[in-house]
């Protein structure tokens, strides 16, 4: 089996806050979806937006556009690739890069400001490299009804062969505070995903509002089913 670097660490990315939550209560949304009203939060569609440039480019996988008490926000999700030198000196490594950026503005026609950027980088010597945002679990919500949007991100990464685990990452950002869970899932002999290996939680989750903990646990449980499809496609 080819050498494999350790999987990317989500917990380290949570400083100072890691990364849309389930759009409109665990329903996927996209640029063409209609507006959805949530307590203290409005999810916006392309039809709601004035004809001015939006953050992102043609390679953007998903935009989640919302309005909360601070103004407008747009979460932009992308996936890119790179090649780096192997630190062991044995050639090169492919790298899959998942990038999430949050842009905000105080009102229509105002300029967009990038509030934060988060990346998950998966280097791999092969034979299989995967990295994907799990878009059905990404969006914006106002779970604690304070008028400020929280952002949830969910993703999966993989490097290796059929016996190697898939890494799962889920996180929620509320203002400047991030909460996250990461762990592993494998395919069993029947081709079903199962959680095993270590599971890590960000230290901040111990003091998180219960509604945030419940939300993250619900998304985490759903990732096992979602990752089965990705795992089967990889092998």
Question: What positions do the PLM features span?
Answer:
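Structural signature of eukaryotic scaffold interfaces centered on beta-propeller domains
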Residues: 63-70, 137-145
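Repeat-based blade/solenoid architectures
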Residues: 48, 55-61, 122-136
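Bacterial N-terminal signal peptides that target proteins for export
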Residues: 2-18
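Acidic/hydrophobic-patterned starts of short beta strands in beta-sheet-rich repeat architectures
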Residues: 70-78, 144-155
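Acidic, small-residue rich beta-repeat scaffolds with periodic aromatic anchors
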Residues: 30-69, 166-168, 173-235
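Short consensus segments that form the blades of beta-propeller domains
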Residues: 84-95, 126-131, 158-164
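C-terminal motif of bacterial Sec signal peptides marking the signal peptidase cleavage site
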Residues: 25-28
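Surface-exposed loop and turn segments in beta-propeller and other repeat-based domains
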Residues: 114-130, 190-201
